[in-house]
A protein has these predicted regions:
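N-terminal entry/capping and adjacent linker segments that precede and initiate structured domains
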Residues: 1-449
């Protein structure tokens, strides 16, 4: 339990002071000798202390505190400050606008990633910040080995990581069957939620033999910890449909099929969730499908003329300030566009930058002589995450995992090792103790990590 700051000390009391004055008188007698007389006078006086009004930390208003908190370097520093006392915690919990601004100014970097492995096994977690004491402390407390998941013969596979939660599946080839499960897991709290599945045949109703599930996405609520939606995207020839699960209603809503105008060219696990919409690129085409989760509107977005989606060379994502962007890789060159408005209010793709990665990647990997390929992993919070995989001369597979800032164009090596597969970044979310979704100020919240 966080303790309150001590109140300012009371002013010093008025204390009596004693003043002593001595008078020395010297006289001469008739015989010439000197006589000295000392007269001492003592008086008591009241001396008043001077009290000045000073500003102390306990006299700061909530607005002043929040202005100071915005200057903290990161989320762990804010957590430590907020849990110092009840009034500081209340200043954070009572103001959603402050939390949104803090998230925008201090986006939390990923502390690691989950790597899907082949075979019936759970994903492997790879830490990215071994020198960060806050990240290491979080990893030690959390369930990053996924031991709280129920046993699955097929193993679990990560499909999305967002706001501190992981979305996992198993038995993907038989959606709705007895061997299929969906689960969310918060490694920091060890909380597991096994989700109910759509009713038999409901998700496939109205489809042909070309029905397929493309993947799942997780949408969380910043201000309601534990509240989330799961978006399942399905395809059938030239049609797509979204099936949405709500953690509040514990039910799935199956949307109608929408004709996107051409045969199926949407690939497994290729989608991105950006600002409340799912974007799925059309393989071999210059466009992508957009599904707005809020309005349930499905539309097609044309891409810049030079973009041709092929495998892992394209990803939709978000800039640091939350704008939709796309990143296209051709050879070792990355092109970036941001969704903007022209002078007439029409949506356009505004070119942002072109960056040649060849020299920088070769300098870092010393593998320019090896044949390999680049895979676009994710574009989030203004960073492009990508990997390069090569086959060494000894016949061993080796991979490097990078981040590229869209703002500074700085390439940074995050990890290297003998791995390949689907990578899912994990970012810590705001602790529930700092969020009040019931209007409370959090005076009874307990301090923790």
């Amino acid at each position: 339990m966080a303790s309150e700051l001590l109140p300012p000390p009371p002013p010093l009391p008025k204390l009596p002071s004693t003043t002593t004055m001595a008078t020395i008188t010297t006289t001469l007698s008739a015989d010439g000798s000197a006589a000295t007389t000392i007269i001492t006078t003592t008086s008591n006086a009241i001396t008043a202390s001077t009290t000045s009004t000073a500003t102390t930390i306990s006299s700061l208003s909530d607005d002043d505190l929040r202005e100071i908190f915005l200057r903290l370097p990161d989320l762990p520093a804010l957590v430590r400050a907020a849990l110092t006392c009840r009034s500081w915690l209340g200043a954070v919990r009572s103001n959603p606008a402050f939390r949104r601004l803090f998230r925008a100014l201090h986006p939390a970097p990923p502390i690691g990633f989950f790597l899907d492995l082949t075979g019936p096994t759970n994903p492997l977690f790879v830490p990215l910040r071994p020198s960060d004491s806050d990240a290491i402390a979080a990893l030690r407390r959390g369930d990053f080995f996924l031991t709280s998941l129920p046993h699955s013969f097929c193993g679990w596979s990560v499909t999305d990581c967002r706001d501190g939660y992981i979305l996992l599946w198993n038995g993907m080839n038989n959606l709705g069957g007895n061997d299929m499960s969906l689960a969310t897991l918060n490694p920091m709290t060890w909380a597991v939620d096994i989700l109910p599945l759509p009713g038999p045949g409901g998700i496939e109703a109205g489809s042909s033999n070309n029905f397929a599930v493309l993947g799942f996405h997780l949408q969380c609520s910043d201000e309601k910890p534990g509240v989330f939606r799961v978006i399942c995207v399905c395809t059938d020839q030239n049609m797509v449909r979204a099936v949405i699960f709500s953690s509040e209603t514990r039910d799935w809503v199956i949307q109608p099929w929408v004709d996107i105008g051409e045969n199926n060219s949407l690939k497994f696990r290729a989608g991105s969730l950006v600002d409340g919409s799912v974007y799925w690129p059309c393989h071999g085409k210059g466009r992508m499908v957009r599904i707005n989760i809020g309005t349930l509107d499905t539309s097609v977005v044309d891409l810049p003329g030079q973009v041709e989606v092929d495998g892992y060379n394209f990803k939709a994502g978000e800039t640091k300030d939350g704008k939709l962007c796309i990143v296209y890789q051709s050879g070792l060159s990355l092109d970036v566009w941001i969704r903007s408005m022209d002078g007439e209010g029409a949506e356009i793709w505004a070119p942002q930058s072109t960056h040649n990665l060849s020299a920088e990647i070769d300098r870092i990997t010393h593998a320019g002589h090896l044949h390999g390929y680049i895979k676009m992993v994710q574009v989030r919070y203004g960073y492009v995450y990508l990997s390069k995989t090569c086959m060494t001369l000894a016949g061993m597979q080796h991979s490097w995992f990078f981040s590229l800032s869209l703002e500074t164009l700085k390439l940074e090596l995050l990890h290297e090792g003998k791995y390949d597969g689907y990578v899912h970044l994990y970012v810590m979310a705001f602790p529930p103790s700092l969020v009040a979704d019931d209007g409370s100020t959090g005076h009874d919240a307990e301090g923790s990590h």
